C-alpha cells in the first residue's frame, strides 16, 4: 500500500497493537511524518457535542465516502506506523481538512 497522505480517511485495527483481533475503525491522517509514521485523528459515528468534534458526512469527501454521518475528534490524536493501516476509504476536501487542522492547532497554541 502507498503511504497515505494528510486528509486521507484510513481504516486501522483497534486496539492498534493487534491487527488480527482488533475492530476496524476509521481515522483521518493529519500528518505524514518522515519514515513510516503517521499522525491520525479518531473518527467515530457516535454523536459528540464537544468544542472540538467536527461533523463529517459524504459531502465532505473529495474521494470515496463514509458509511454514515460521523465526527472527527481532533483531541484524539495518535501515531501509528504505516504497516498498521488496513486500507484507505477516501479523502476529505481541503476545506474539511483545514477545519480539522485548525482545531488540532488550538490544542497546542491556545
Language model regions located:
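Conserved functional hotspots at enzyme active or ligand-binding sites that engage polyanionic ligands
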Residues: 1-110
Amino acid at each position: 500500500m502507498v503511504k497515505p497522505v494528510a486528509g486521507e480517511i484510513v481504516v486501522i485495527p483497534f486496539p492498534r497493537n493487534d491487527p488480527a483481533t482488533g475492530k476496524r475503525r476509521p481515522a483521518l491522517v493529519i500528518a505524514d511524518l518522515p519514515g513510516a509514521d503517521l499522525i491520525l485523528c479518531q473518527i467515530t459515528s457516535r454523536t459528540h457535542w464537544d468544542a472540538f468534534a467536527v461533523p463529517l458526512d459524504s459531502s465532505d469527501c473529495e474521494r470515496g465516502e463514509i458509511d454514515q454521518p460521523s465526527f472527527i475528534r481532533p483531541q484524539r490524536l495518535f501515531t501509528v506506523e504505516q504497516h498498521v493501516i488496513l486500507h484507505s476509504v477516501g479523502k476529505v476536501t481541503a476545506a474539511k481538512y483545514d477545519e480539522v487542522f485548525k482545531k488540532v492547532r488550538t490544542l497546542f497554541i491556545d
